[in-house]
Amino acid sequence: MPITQNYGTGRRKSSTARVFLRKGSGNISVNGRPLDEFFGRETARMIVRQPLELTKNVSNFDILITATGGGTTGQAGAIRLGIARALVEYDTSLKPELRKAGFMTRDPREVERKKVGLHKARRATQFSKR
C-alpha cells in the first residue's frame, strides 16, 4: 500500500518549512525531534498547532516537518503556513475557514536592510543642534 501524503511549503522571514501530512495519531516531529522538544516556548508550539485546532484535525494526522533558516518565531510561522497549505491540499473545503483565520497568507514582512551612514536600518547618529 503506497503512503499517501500531502505536502505544503511555508516561509516566514528567512525561515522555510517543508511539511508532510500523513494519516496518523497526531505525532508532530520537526527535524526528527518531537514538537515539544524542538520548540521550548509554548507560544511557538501553539502557533504550529493553530491550523489543526481550527479544522479539528489535531489527532488525525502525523506531521513530518523540515525547518531551516531563521529563528524560532520565523520557523513557527513558516510551519503554520506549511501545515495550512498541506491541509488545503488534503481537503479544499477547509480553505475558506483557514483563509478567514489568516493562516493561508504569507507574512510579507522581512528585515529592512542597513543603510550606509546609519547605525541600523533607520537609527542615525544623535543629532546635536549646537
From Swiss-Prot:
The lineage of its organism: Bacteria, Pseudomonadati, Pseudomonadota, Gammaproteobacteria, Lysobacterales. SUPFAM superfamilies: Ribosomal protein S5 domain 2-like. Keywords: Ribonucleoprotein, Ribosomal protein. GO terms for cellular component: cytosolic small ribosomal subunit. Residues 116-130 have a biased composition (Basic residues). Belongs to the universal ribosomal protein uS9 family. It comes from the Bacteria. This is Small ribosomal subunit protein uS9. GO terms for biological process: translation. GO terms for molecular function: RNA binding; structural constituent of ribosome. Residues 111-130 are annotated as: Disordered. Pfam families: Ribosomal_S9 (PF00380). Coiled coil: none annotated.
